[in-house]
């Protein structure tokens, strides 16, 4: 299979095949493996990104720093590094799991469904951003507490996966601990 794909999973989270990425995301999306990463700079600010309008699901919505899908034979950590370079042009370090068993299903206003087992990580950015406009239309560095308050006050302005990740008490505490070094 050429191009990006998703790793399909059975209900127990075991690999159960692969499917082309764009064919996978429909109104009846099968359960598949993904990842989500919250990136912090040296000043302790969180990178929040706004998804490009060309994205199939949740175009123009604010979300956490970077998301994607590991490819067959690729570790989640290697996939996060690959997508951080592709979407944001950055190098990262200190990649740490903060919500390894996160799973969700959500439907965007266009009817596209996300149905993912999506381990959540935090990492430190070690280089300047060079944003890929096909992936990210805007971005903002902000304090973690400010972002958490915004997620609570206006969840409709953010991706559902970011809102759900931040609503988990343990994940929120691990993000705070990570950010404090």
From Swiss-Prot:
GO function terms (MF aspect): isopentenyl-diphosphate delta-isomerase activity; metal ion binding
EC class name: isomerase
Gene Ontology CC terms: cytoplasm
Protein residues bound to Mn(2+): 25, 32, 69, 114, 116
Active site residues according to the UniProt entry: 67, 116
Catalyzed chemical reaction(s): isopentenyl diphosphate = dimethylallyl diphosphate
Keyword Isomerase: yes
Keywords from the UniProt entry: Cytoplasm, Isomerase, Isoprene biosynthesis, Magnesium, Manganese, Metal-binding
Parts forming coiled coils: none
Keyword Repeat: no
Cofactor: Mg(2+); Mn(2+)
Domain Nudix hydrolase per the UniProt entry, residue ranges: 30-164
Pathway per the UniProt entry: Isoprenoid biosynthesis; dimethylallyl diphosphate biosynthesis; dimethylallyl diphosphate from isopentenyl diphosphate: step 1/1
UniProt remark on cofactor binding: Binds 1 Mg(2+) ion per subunit. The magnesium ion binds only when substrate is bound. Binds 1 Mn(2+) ion per subunit.
Gene3D superfamilies: Nucleoside Triphosphate Pyrophosphohydrolase
Classification via PROSITE patterns: NUDIX
Domain of life: Bacteria
Enzyme Commission number: 5.3.3.2
Any GO BP: dimethylallyl diphosphate biosynthetic process
Quaternary structure note: Homodimer.
Similarity-based family: Belongs to the IPP isomerase type 1 family.
The protein's role, per its UniProt record: Catalyzes the 1,3-allylic rearrangement of the homoallylic substrate isopentenyl (IPP) to its highly electrophilic allylic isomer, dimethylallyl diphosphate (DMAPP).
Name used for this protein in its record: Isopentenyl-diphosphate Delta-isomerase
């Amino acid at each position: 299979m050429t191009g990006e794909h998703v790793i399909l999973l059975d209900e127990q989270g075991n690999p159960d095949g692969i499917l082309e990425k764009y064919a996978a995301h429909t109104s009846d999306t099968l359960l598949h493996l993904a990842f989500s990463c919250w990136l912090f700079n040296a000043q302790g600010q969180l990178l929040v990104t706004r998804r490009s309008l060309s994205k199939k699901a949740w175009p123009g919505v604010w979300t956490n720093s970077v998301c994607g899908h590991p490819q067959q034979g690729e570790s989640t950590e290697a996939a996060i590094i690959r997508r951080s370079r592709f979407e944001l042009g950055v190098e990262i370090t200190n990649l740490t799991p903060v919500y390894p068993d996160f799973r969700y299903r959500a439907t965007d206003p266009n009817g596209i469904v996300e149905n993912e087992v999506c381990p959540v990580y935090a990492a430190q950015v070690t280089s300047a951003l060079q944003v890929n406009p096909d992936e990210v239309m805007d971005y903002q560095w902000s304090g973690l507490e400010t972002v958490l308050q915004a997620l609570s006050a206006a969840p409709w302005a953010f991706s559902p996966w970011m809102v759900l990740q931040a609503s988990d008490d343990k994940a929120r505490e691990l993000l705070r601990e990570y950010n404090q070094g």
